[in-house]
């Protein structure tokens, strides 16, 4: 693993314009619903924040003051990722280690869990952001397989609150910033970030993935992402980056995903075409990596006689 380079690619407006011509955009109501849901917040810092001491108090505050499906009366709604990106820059939250971003309709959590386990078994210190949690909020933010402590999370919330000023943030945007803040302070060797919803406009997408994964694409969150698989796929493909591996486990992928990867110069790797696995006898399996159209990789790499997970 090497320290990740700082990417200068932040805006895919040109590519978005291309797809406005090539593919039908999601209905206005769908985009409005998505942006409305992602922009439901309270604008100004609340006096209540001064009294936030426990994690449960913080979460109750964020759930009531920053979410709810409608904009509060403090200021105007600022659509897109500009708000959360501005707070990220004030906090200097540029990851200093490789970042893996995982999107998709199904299988995101499983992929994150497998990646985290593999890296940790290889001796790397991991930071993993997932959602939703099952029992406790802390499960969303794990360092080396262990949920972050209440005190660690509340300290991060306080830093975010101090940095945001009058910039409004949603519950999930707080969650995303806190995770990366905690991983940086823990000096993680790799960050694994699961997208919450979609990809292109999700808070996780303010961080450039050194590798981006789309597990699968199907109709989900149609009110937010669109009514066709192609529309959903375009939103999820928004996590791809120029010159970086873009892995898709669905082959053939939706055309909008394929074309977006080509348009921005991402290195698209498809299951079955560029990598795959086969079952062997005696509870073993093999992994094959044979990129056909990759600009980053050449030749084949095989791993044979791998044991089945216990």
Regions inferred by a protein language model and the residue ranges of each:
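Short functional linear segments
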Residues: 47, 51-104, 117-122
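Residue-level signal for inorganic ion chemistry
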Residues: 105, 126, 192, 215, ...
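Cationic, low-complexity basic patches in intrinsically disordered or flexible, solvent-exposed regions
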Residues: 16, 21, 26, 51
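Hydrophobic positions on the alpha1 helix immediately C-terminal to the Walker A/P-loop
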Residues: 111-114
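Conserved lysine of the Walker
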Residues: 108
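Adenine nucleotide phosphate-binding catalytic loops in nucleotide-utilizing enzymes
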Residues: 56-57, 147-169, 219-233, 237, ...
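ATP-dependent carboxylate-amine ligase catalytic core
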Residues: 72-81, 85-96, 121-207, 223-225, ...
